[in-house]
Amino acid sequence: MKNNIIKKIEDIIGKKNVLLSSEDKNKYLTEWRNRYPGKARAVLRPKSTKEVSLLLKLFHQKNIPVTPQGGNTGLVGGQITYSSKDFIISLERMNKLINFNKVDETIIVQAGMLLTQIHNICDENDMLFPLSLASEGSCTIGGNLATNAGGVGVLYYGNTRDLTLGLEVVLSDGSIINLLKTLKKDNTGYSLKDLFVGSEGTLGIITAASLKIFQKPKDKLTFLASASSPKKALDFLRMLQKNTSIPLTSFEIMNNHSVDIVLRNFGETKLPISKKSNWYILFEFSSYEKNKNTTESISEIVNLGIEKKFI
């Protein structure tokens, strides 16, 4: 006879969305390096905020542990359970666009939408959602919110928290808090959304978010340089920031180990620098107008960094 709790869960989300076999659960219980092999009684795949609410209400009543999961791209094991009594709630089916407003420069999506899907929606409408990171093809916006992801554009656009206008959250007892505001100039009451962003599911499960989007730049200049040390890289960053009014929208320092992993796993990728280094810098300027003088101006500043031996 089927366990009573499993039967109740199936009544909420449907039998096919309750994964019980080891084969079905496996991809949710391991990350790509196989460093955090987990255990779970079942993986649950709700499709709506209401279903998440009913699940958490049930687990709250039964005092059953649960872990929310986005794209399972985290590298510290926070998205995986380690007890065969616990449950994982995967939000992968909650991947719908709720609203897109080009005039207000906002987008509202369910938490299971892939980051790259948000990029595509914005790109099709000549807009930009600036959060960008290596796992964007498989990570979800819910995971980005739960971890307050930074990405390569963090110095200019800020962390995920800075890009968030509002949230919809389900608390541990099943209560739904709708904070899906799109008003940018909002000084009413406590900023509860800021508590949930970065809380990694400990305060509740984020089910939807309203986000800031931006006009898409007309031109981009992307550079890869080598540096002898992180200090030299930071000296170069300060020099760039002081000597140009053109937005420096990305600046990422990478060690040679990280670059070697990319080169080993992506065979067509080539390092466009002849001499290997211990440190590399990936940086990008964005402009809202195409201008030959812009390219020349930035090139002069980069060459100045070479002369000063920052890069």
Language model feature labels by segment:
Residues 1-311:
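Noncatalytic alpha-helical scaffold of FAD-dependent oxidoreductases
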